[in-house]
Amino acid sequence: MRKTKIVCTLGPATDKEGVLREMMLSGMNVARFNFSHGTHSEHKVRLDAVKALREELDLPVAAMLDTKGPEVRLRNFKNGSVELAAGQAFTLTTEDVEGDETRCAITYPQLPQDVSAGDTILLDDGLVRLTVLETTATAIRCRVENSGVMKNHKGVNVPGVSLSMPYMSQQDKDDILFGVEQGFDFIAASFVRCAADVREIRRVLNAAHSRIRIIAKIENQEGVSNLREILAEADGVMVARGDMGVEIDFTEIPAIQKDMIAQCVACGKPVITATQMLDSMIENPRPTRAEITDVANAIYDGTSAIMLSGETAAGKYPVEAVKTMDAIARKTESNIDCSRGTVPPSRTHLSVTAATAHAACTTAADIGADAILTVSQGGITAQMVSRFRPEAKVVALLLDPQIRRQMALYWGLVPIMMERADSTDELVHSAIDTAEQAGLIKHGDLVVVTAGVPVGVSGTTNMIRIEQVGGALVNGTGIGDETASGPLCVCRTPEEVAGKFRPGDVLVVPYTNNELLPYMKEAAAVISEEISAEGHTATVGLLLHKPVIIGAVQATRRLQDGVTVSVDCSRGIVQIMPQ
């Protein structure tokens, strides 16, 4: 099961019949809506399609609204695009004009006041570089330094220049409120520079009584420098390498990416690595070797999610791009040693919830558990378990559909819904039954369950239990690590053994001695109430290489003749064989 999540940007390419369905079935976890393009009505049509499909397929695909942010973009060209030649003059204007080979309108009216002669302006993530020659109240006259084709709405960056524009525009506020109304799960906040930017968005969400989570997009040096304070306010981070690679020396991007991922993992916040991950698949059905390595390295670094942009929004092969991401992630994860799995706590003292989550992960590793089941009211426990990166499958059992979708972004979590429980025992059994019915665990699996007492109170996770799916009939100490199965032959005396034992039975007795040796040789396994590891049962079991469990308290009373069971010496348990 893939632990790294996949974020896919929706657009014209995903509007084609059947494409969105195939993307979901191929592994898309989060649908990203880029509000730098499109209208509210266009986004609503796509969101409604996501809602309908996730309901039909029972897949917790989250919806992420990516804000326009305090960005500067070109407006429209008369013919949709122009070709700029090195050395030519080109003017950026605040006037409302259709663009051509000589000029184009921009979205930020104060840019002529913010730049000066000699400044560099980059278009379309640096595809074309301009040098400012002079400015007027409404225009910036430039020289084109390199040739390139420029299209509508491409980004405008001014490296090293602090723009005077406010963080949140009215358009962004309207978009966020639209997102609240339509039930989006995440806001990807563009161009976050400091914690105050996150708080500004949080105030809008709080006023609207919304639980939408905020992912801070780090795209410039100011955001990188303030990452620690941003992480304290945001619910997660996106390594937005497109504008970052324009605003910052591109040779620094790999180190910045690694550091950002490490900081996010250490504090338990999800981190999305984005931009040009499989860029060649916009046009080609297969990625380059460099792109495969880029995706894999982000996963090796510990990224929570990997993102597709133009590959799915406007590419020729959106479904293939998702399948490629999924395949790279699965193969890469198979090469990562998660046997101890946990990331050390970033500080000496943890909260009770975090400490319980950490203990659940280490317990699962110690006993070789098949899964960790985390029952969480608000998703906090599930987030903490995700933080410690266990090798075992992590099933997050939740009561709220939106929180279930939000957990779909977190590393390693498989979020499912469960019914509310009134007691601890009921909660544990309900969690196991729900996960088993979903096909995530099976009869005989060993699971670690973590939840809170009292039941149903958010933030009270303080309980860990180790459970066997299906329940063990008896427990004891296994001799060796073999397994066996067969019908039970429960006897309290040697005479009873002689009267009813048949070869291949699982022999259950209070103790053994040499009188029972012939029967022990022909038994599939032996279960004894005898406690001593140096006693007759254990010694004979080792000599005969026979599956043996000793110290099975009241086994002759609790087990019933003829029931077919499995005996697992490595775990010291006896279970009914599933039908």
Description of each model-found segment:
Residues 350-358, 362-364, 466-519:
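Protease-associated
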Residues 70-169, 173, 434-435, 440-495, ...:
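Acidic, glycine-rich flexible loop/linker segments
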